[in-house]
């Protein structure tokens, strides 16, 4: 069984709650442990692994991981536990890190957030339905760019981003990467992964550094976070410690009573050096500044719960980590400030089934409008980001004013998305259970 780590300053106290906690707090954290365990114990509608962390009043007070990062369906004795150091492909939480790196470049005067991005890309990028309206970095960061994912939004390293946008391009898709007339740049919201592939490419252009290397240099190394957008940064030993992402489906056929089947990061039959895994992720011939989608800036970051905790703490501490300035407070203010809000007639955006009604620069603001809420019976406003891909479900949200925040991660979905919509929100049913457990037990006073 895994242990809960309750943090007092820098001391981890395994197997016990924080020494100065009240009896009520101890009881609440114990109940939270039990609520998370229920998700693991539910063979039909549960998850293979779950992790959670809570910051209250600026201090990390709760951390828990349960379940498995690796499952051997033939012999459960070979299962491996999910831990605070298990790295997972964290999906769209990746975008928050990219946004922060971009804001750093703005602080340095290398990027003007309100300038036409064509200036940085080296080619003109405009929505042909709005040829006179520049697309800016703020529009990319806030998903109001009027660009769309289409069927393909990550393309091989030998191709330039232009192949997505010029009519003769191999990935043009008859203009599917452009919003139609009526969804103007800077006005209409539509959550778009491609925006962050473009941001990653601009980072490369202005720094003359490959995206994955720049992220390590600017973000991960200064914060002592062992994370990367490049799978080849991890040796075979590190890969063996990765957490797999699971679903109870194979080739689109679901069986909720069946086994967990790995969808992502199962490297048990692949070797990173001299074999096909290295060949798959071979960047030797890539030309920096042409197509950073190959690093999946929208969702390809591998990071652990421990790494996410450091990141959440930095945001809560207004840009500082261990005394080092990562972002200015002004930049964090800009990220969290609403850039787009759903209008009263609900005609200026696609709300992602009601989940997204207010967005900043890489940050979603949960405002308890429609299905944009954590709880059915309490309105709790926090800001951060959701994440979902291949079975992973995750979220990180903070209340900057009161220095509170929480993280959750789950590395699998036992049923199809279509059958597991939330009862009261735009989240999935598993997320409603986790968010309810965390907020009702860790933040009953809110």
Segments (PLM) and residue ranges:
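Short, gly/Ser/Thr-rich active-site loops of penicillin-recognizing serine hydrolases
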Residues: 336-348, 414-446
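Short, well-ordered beta-strand elements
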Residues: 393-399, 403-419
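Short active-site loop at a secondary-structure junction
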Residues: 44-51, 74-139, 180-194, 296-299, ...
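Sec-dependent signal peptide cleavage junction
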Residues: 12-23
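Short, surface-exposed loop or secondary-structure junction motifs
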Residues: 129-380
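Bacterial N-terminal signal peptides
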Residues: 3-12
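Short, conserved catalytic-motif segment at the N-terminal edge
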Residues: 27-88, 177-179
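Short beta->alpha transition motifs characteristic of CBS
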Residues: 62-70, 389-390, 410-413
């Amino acid at each position: 069984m895994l242990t809960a780590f309750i943090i007092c300053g820098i001391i981890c106290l395994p197997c016990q709650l924080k020494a100065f906690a009240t009896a009520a707090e101890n009881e609440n954290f114990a109940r939270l442990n039990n609520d998370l365990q229920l998700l693991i114990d539910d063979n039909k509608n549960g998850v293979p692994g779950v992790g959670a962390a809570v910051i209250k009043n600026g201090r990390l007070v709760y951390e828990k991981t349960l379940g498995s990062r690796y499952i051997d369906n033939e012999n459960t004795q070979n299962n491996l536990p999910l831990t605070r150091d298990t790295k997972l492909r964290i999906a769209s939480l990746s975008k928050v890190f990219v946004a922060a790196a971009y804001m750093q470049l703005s602080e340095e005067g290398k990027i003007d957030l309100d300038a036409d991005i064509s200036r940085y890309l080296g080619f003109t990028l405009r929505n042909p339905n709005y040829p006179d309206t520049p697309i800016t970095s703020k529009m990319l960061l806030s998903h109001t760019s009027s660009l769309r994912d289409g069927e393909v939004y990550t393309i091989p390293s030998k191709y330039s981003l232009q192949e997505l946008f010029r009519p003769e391009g191999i990935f043009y898709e008859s203009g599917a990467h452009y919003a139609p007339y009526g969804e103007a740049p800077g006005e209409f919201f539509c959550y778009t992964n491609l925006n962050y592939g473009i941001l990653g490419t601009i980072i490369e252009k202005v720094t003359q550094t490959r995206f994955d290397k720049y992220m390590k240099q600017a973000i991960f190394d200064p914060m002592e976070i062992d994370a990367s957008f490049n799978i080849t940064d991890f040796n075979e030993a590190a890969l063996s410690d990765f957490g797999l992402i699971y679903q109870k489906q194979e080739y689109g056929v679901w069986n909720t009573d069946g086994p967990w089947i790995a969808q992502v990061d199962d490297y048990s039959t692949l070797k990173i050096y001299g074999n096909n895994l290295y060949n798959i992720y071979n960047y030797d011939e890539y030309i920096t500044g042409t197509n950073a989608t190959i690093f999946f800036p929208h969702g390809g970051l591998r990071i652990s719960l421990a790494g996410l905790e450091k990141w959440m703490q930095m945001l809560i501490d207004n840009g500082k980590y261990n005394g080092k300035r990562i972002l200015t407070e002004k930049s964090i203010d800009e990220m969290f400030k609403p850039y787009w809000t759903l209008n009263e007639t609900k005609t200026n955006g696609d709300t992602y089934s009601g989940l997204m009604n207010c967005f900043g620069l890489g940050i979603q603001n949960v405002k308890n409008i429609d299905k944009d809420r954590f709880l059915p019976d309490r309105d709790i406003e926090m800001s951060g980001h959701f994440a979902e891909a291949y079975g992973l479900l995750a979220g990180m949200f903070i209340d900057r004013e009161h220095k509170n925040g929480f993280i959750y991660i789950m590395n699998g979905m036992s049923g199809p998305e279509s059958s597991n919509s939330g009862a009261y929100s735009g989240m999935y049913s598993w997320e409603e259970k986790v968010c309810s457990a965390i907020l009702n037990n860790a933040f009953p006073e809110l």
